[in-house]
Amino acid sequence: MNSRCALVSKIIPFSCVDGPGSRLALFLQGCNLRCKNCHNPWTMGRCNDCGECVPQCPHQALQIVDGKVVWNAVVCEQCDTCLKRCPQHATPMAQSMSVDEVLSHVRKAVLFIEGITVSGGEATTQLPFVVALFTAIKNDPQLRHLTCLVDSNGMLSETGWEKLLPVCDGAMLDLKAWGSECHQQLTGRDNQQIKRSIYLLAERGKLAELRLLVIPGQVDYLQHIEELAAFIKGLGDVPVRLNAFHAHGVYGEAQSWASATPEDVEPLADALKVRGVSRLIFPALYL
């Protein structure tokens, strides 16, 4: 029995966009960045039971019980009104789940998946749970063949990675901007620790994928292409995924930002290729 718990925003039993192959994707609640372009902004914060969402629910799926916001999954229509109203960028639908409870979901899907990806929010803000979950999977004869990945923003310290890497098969990280000033403008934090995390993971052979998000007029990749290309080449044979920003699902000023087109992505790809970065993955979809 493993009763260690985490606050879980969502479980997708079969995902083909959260790492290689078909995977169970576990989204944890809470993030230590505040990205303007976040497509899951309701996973940033954690519910403080303020109750502001309760009277807004058109299906009466929320109520206050003993001072806590309680969600009724039976009557909920998944209209997401509560997500748009929450001042905390949280969700009343997040549930506390134990390692054993998550493992029960994994076992139901095990015949149809190649692994599990823990995402968020930011997975590593609930690091002890992730370590316990991956350890349990690696120690289970029926589950140990599954690969265990994290989708992370890279803010975890070196000490934290040392705890996670023995039971983690790899991490997928975003480098949202090259310069710290640009990165802080986009996310609220600088990117020095993120760059250190990327280097550490590459050195350990655990950097499954580096991601660059093209946001027209907002990112600085091309302005710093020499440094960026040299940085990526120094990581070794790591796949680099070029993602195209779109405004669907974002809040605030990013709703007015232009979506990225092939004409926005291709100049970056060409500039990287010319400088020896050739293992590129292009967007599967432009919106």
Curated annotation (Swiss-Prot):
Residues 17-284 form the Radical SAM core domain. It comes from the Bacteria. Its EC number is 1.97.1.-. Its cofactor is [4Fe-4S] cluster. [4Fe-4S] cluster 2 binds at C47, C50, C53, C86. The keyword Magnesium does not apply. [4Fe-4S] cluster 3 binds at C57, C76, C79, C82. Disulfide bonds: none annotated. CDD domains: Radical_SAM. The keyword rRNA-binding does not apply. This is Putative glycyl-radical enzyme activating enzyme YjjW. It comes from Escherichia coli (strain K12).
